[in-house]
Amino acid sequence: MIPYAGQTVIALVPEHYAAIERTVALLDGIAHSASYQAEVDAGADAGVRFEPGNRGVFMGYDFHLGPDGPRLIEINTNAGGALLNGLHTASLCDPERLACICADLLPIETMQARIVQQFISEFRAVRGPEAELGRIAIVDERPREQFLFAEFELLVKLFEQAGIRAEILDTEDLARDGQELPDLVYLRDKALLFDDQRSG
């Protein structure tokens, strides 16, 4: 069973979709403005001030629909569920009736390739345009106990089909002495500052 999955496709009215687009564009602009970054940097440690040059593959803006339209509930820099929800929604799509929704999800292989390409693009934004992504680690605290572990497994298969070695690691196992480090970490752990002993 897919988390959050239902059997009904909910279509947004154009005004609500436009409101979401405007809000996301506004927030993205603010987050990358010099004045906002200076404000955040003033009270932050070196890990927060580090600017890797990439935007984030699964930067997520969680909107809930209500009587007055969409309301922003959460901004998530490492959102999960894109692959699972994409596959589920694609299974409900009727291209003849819902062409606007289905265009980004069908064929499924195209959607999957876009997800892989996002990770490659993020990697190259930091390492250079010709860099090869050879190994990726999906990292979380006690990953097998996580709500979206099924998606971790699907992502491993997806990366491996694209010729990228992939594995699921516990946060505390990521940087053991003598262990080969991955080229890229998809960090699902919510301890983003790595400020406790297990992620130090």
Predicted regions and their residues:
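Short, solvent-exposed beta-strand-terminating loops
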Residues: 27-31, 79-86
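Short coil-to-helix leader/linker segments, especially the first N-terminal amphipathic alpha-helix
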Residues: 42-48, 53-55, 161-167
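Conserved metal-phosphate-binding beta-hairpin within the catalytic cores
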Residues: 48-79
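Low-complexity, highly charged intrinsically disordered N-terminal segments
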Residues: 1-46
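Domain-scale recognition of functional cores that engage charged ligands
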Residues: 66-67, 82-85, 90-200
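Residue-level signal for well-ordered alpha-helical segments
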Residues: 1-7, 40-42, 52, 69, ...
